From Swiss-Prot:
Quaternary structure and interacting proteins, as annotated: EIF4F is a multi-subunit complex, the composition of which varies with external and internal environmental conditions. It is composed of at least EIF4A, EIF4E and EIF4G. EIF4E is also known to interact with other partners. In higher plants two isoforms of EIF4F have been identified, named isoform EIF4F and isoform EIF(iso)4F. Isoform EIF4F has subunits p220 and p26, whereas isoform EIF(iso)4F has subunits p82 and p28.
Tissue: Expressed ubiquitously with highest levels in young leaves and roots, and lowest levels in flowers.
PTM summary: According to the redox status, the Cys-102-Cys-141 disulfide bridge may have a role in regulating protein function by affecting its ability to bind capped mRNA.
InterPro entries the record matches: TIF_eIF4e-like, TIF_eIF_4E, TIF_eIF_4E_CS
GO biological-process terms attached to the record: defense response to virus; regulation of translation
Consequence of gene loss (knockout): (Microbial infection) No significant resistance against peanut stripe virus (PStV). Plants lacking both eIF4E and eIF(iso)4E exhibit an increased resistance against PStV.
Function: Component of the protein complex eIF4F, which is involved in the recognition of the mRNA cap, ATP-dependent unwinding of 5'-terminal secondary structure and recruitment of mRNA to the ribosome. Recognizes and binds the 7-methylguanosine-containing mRNA cap during an early step in the initiation of protein synthesis and facilitates ribosome binding by inducing the unwinding of the mRNAs secondary structures. Key component of recessive resistance to potyviruses such as peanut stripe virus (PStV).
Entry binding sites for mRNA: 47-52, 79, 97-98, 148-153
Species for this entry: Arachis hypogaea (Peanut)
GO molecular function: RNA 7-methylguanosine cap binding; translation initiation factor activity
Name recorded for this polypeptide: Eukaryotic translation initiation factor isoform 4E
Length: 203
């Protein structure tokens, strides 16, 4: 069952718990690039553990059919415990500030108080990413769904924070995709490292 599979991933944070998508008859629909799901469970941190030690690479896919199988079985934020994250990033990019592709980047963030709404925005964003719907798709690293006790959030990570034109275009397109009317903000990863809450751009 999908719920059992999701539970197994949440409990063990191991790629070994995710079954390979079953082969389907006929030709598969290849994506423009490979994408990788990651899972980070911070709900039970080990004492003295460094940030990022609970981050696990879970599954890499490159077809539409694999994506839907994985999403249906496992990757819905509403199934996560508090203080856990799902990530979908381009293969080869780790969802860390330290990754060379992310180091000079930043993120657009939207918050949600409803799990169903978070699930919907997460799905719409993932479909837009794997479907290459952004004009500046090469500047996008991936998306993170974060479940927290007070308020959940979705963050779209990009590569070149200093490129205001690219980030504004991505932000406007993302708002359209997830059907959000409230203002969303963009933060540089450099500011987050220094614990600065300053937002650089907004749409």
């Amino acid at each position: 069952m999908a719920t059992e599979t999701a539970g197994a991933v949440v409990e063990s944070s191991s790629a070994a718990t995710v079954p390979s998508p079953a082969p389907e008859a006929g030709s598969k629909h290849k994506l423009e690039r490979k994408w990788t799901f990651w899972f980070d469970n911070q709900s039970k941190p080990k004492q003295g553990a460094a940030w990022g030690t609970s981050l696990r690479e879970v599954y890499t896919f490159d077809t539409v059919e694999e994506f839907w199988c994985l999403y249906d079985q496992v990757f819905k934020p509403s199934k996560l415990p508090g203080n856990a994250d799902f990530h979908l990033f381009k293969t080869g990019i780790e969802p860390k500030w330290e990754d060379p592709e992310c180091a000079k980047g930043g993120k657009w963030t939207v918050t949600s108080n409803r799990k169903a709404n978070l699930d919907n925005m997460w799905l719409e964003t993932m479909m837009a990413l794997i479907g290459e719907q952004f004009d500046d798709a090469e500047d996008i690293c991936g998306v993170v769904a974060s479940v927290r006790q007070r308020q959940d959030k979705l963050s779209l990570w990009t590569k070149t924070a200093a490129n205001e034109a690219a980030q504004m275009g991505i932000g406007r397109k993302w708002k359209e995709i997830i059907d959000v009317t409230d203002k969303i903000i963009y933060n540089f990863h450099d500011d987050s490292r220094t614990r600065s809450s300053k937002s650089r751009y907004s749409v």
